[in-house]
């Protein structure tokens, strides 16, 4: 069975692939806390498929392989056979599951059909986190060389390339963009904004999704306008100005390296707090990853731009025009920052303050 999508930059080494997969699986279990999750999930015989009701992928495809509990069963089958006493005994005394290259290819295809939105966890009567199991499967696959090309290219450039960001934007180009946005904001909106660069000792070091410099200039201008209006002390670093962290989607090891690089930039600039842009996955990876990999309780605080804006609004440091937006507006919760009950009410209260017809 061939993998339907092209995953590799280099040719995949398929020699003893099942053995290498199991070795990677064993190493991850030894150096992480995934074992209790898998042990609990593997003891549950229930596959009621209630998760299918909330899965947007299954609702669109109708394909049974997109039912979250069925996808989780692929990795749990491997775990039960090779990492539990019952599985080892059944292999000795009778027929049992055998991991093959075709089975690994099937996992590679099906694990990357999941968006990892984690809606299924909310529906599961036993609270099984199918997205987390899927992500663990992706991590094991990554350790044996099976990862989608786009993720590999972007992450390599971020960690090992000259630009240290996923879009390969040179620092000089980033600074040119910021200067242009300052002029554009003044011309279009009559607002004087600034993008401080490499300003040591700032309270906040800003890490937006680097793609904002190419695709979402209004988002950057809005953030700069808020910082200007509130007198915020902030800066953008030239050695690392990318909050994107694709490790969140497929590798704890790489997630840790990326958030560590953010903390290194914070320390280089003698900043106090990390300020993340509106990007959901960039926010979640920093909020969860920095305490995990960079000092625990002593890790630098991580603030999302919506949290900063909301606090400034509540404190009276940010003045807005009530009813400035007359059109009907609603808010779609980003799964990465709302599913964990982190940022829910703040954006709604901001919108209510500036929208004439906000509907929730």
Residue ranges and their predicted role:
Residues 282-283, 308-311, 336-339:
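Short, catalytically relevant binding-site loops at active-site mouths
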Residues 256-264, 308-317:
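Active-site glycine-rich loop that binds ribose-phosphate moieties when present
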Residues 1-53, 57-60, 69-70, 74-83, ...:
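Iron-sulfur (Fe-S) cluster-binding modules
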Residues 67, 129, 133, 219, ...:
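Residues at alpha-helix caps and immediate loop-helix transition turns in enzyme cores, especially N-
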Residues 283-306:
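Short acidic, glycine/proline-enriched helix-loop-strand junctions
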Residues 57-70, 126-138:
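Short cysteine/histidine-rich zinc-coordinating motifs and their immediately flanking basic loops
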């Amino acid at each position: 069975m061939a993998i339907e999508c092209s995953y590799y930059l280099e040719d995949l080494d398929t020699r003893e692939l099942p053995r290498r997969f199991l070795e990677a699986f064993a190493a991850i279990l030894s150096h992480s806390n995934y074992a209790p999750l898998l042990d609990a999930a593997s003891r549950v015989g229930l596959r009621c498929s209630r998760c299918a009701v909330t899965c947007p992928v299954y609702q669109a495809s109708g394909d049974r392989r997109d039912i979250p509990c069925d996808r989780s069963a692929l990795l749990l089958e491997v775990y039960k056979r090779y990492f539990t006493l019952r599985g080892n005994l059944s292999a000795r005394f009778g027929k049992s599951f055998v991991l093959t290259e075709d089975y690994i290819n099937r996992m590679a295809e099906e694990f990357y059909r999941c968006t990892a939105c984690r809606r299924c966890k909310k529906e599961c009567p036993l609270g099984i986190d199918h997205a987390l199991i899927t992500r663990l499967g992706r991590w094991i696959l990554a350790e044996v060389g099976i990862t989608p090309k786009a993720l590999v290219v972007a992450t390599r450039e971020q960690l090992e390339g000259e630009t240290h960001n996923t879009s390969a934007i040179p620092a000089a180009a980033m600074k040119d963009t910021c200067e242009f946005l300052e002029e554009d904001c003044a011309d279009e909106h009559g607002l004087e904004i600034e993008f401080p660069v490499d300003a040591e000792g700032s309270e906040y070091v800003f890490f937006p999704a680097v793609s904002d410099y190419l695709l979402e200039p209004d988002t950057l201008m809005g953030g700069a306008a808020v910082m200007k209006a509130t007198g915020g002390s902030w800066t953008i670093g030239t050695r690392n100005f990318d909050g994107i962290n694709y490790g969140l989607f497929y590798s704890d090891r790489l997630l840790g390296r990326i958030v560590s690089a953010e903390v290194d930039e914070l320390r280089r600039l003698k900043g106090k707090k990390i300020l993340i842009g509106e990007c959901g996955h960039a926010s979640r990876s920093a909020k969860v990853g920095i305490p995990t990999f960079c000092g625990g309780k002593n890790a630098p605080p991580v603030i999302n731009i919506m949290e900063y804006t909301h606090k400034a609004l509540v404190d009276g440091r940010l003045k807005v025009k009530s009813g400035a937006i007359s059109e009907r507006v609603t808010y779609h919760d980003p799964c990465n920052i709302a599913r964990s009950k982190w940022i829910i009410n703040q954006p709604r209260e901001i919108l209510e303050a500036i929208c004439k017809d906000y509907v929730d």
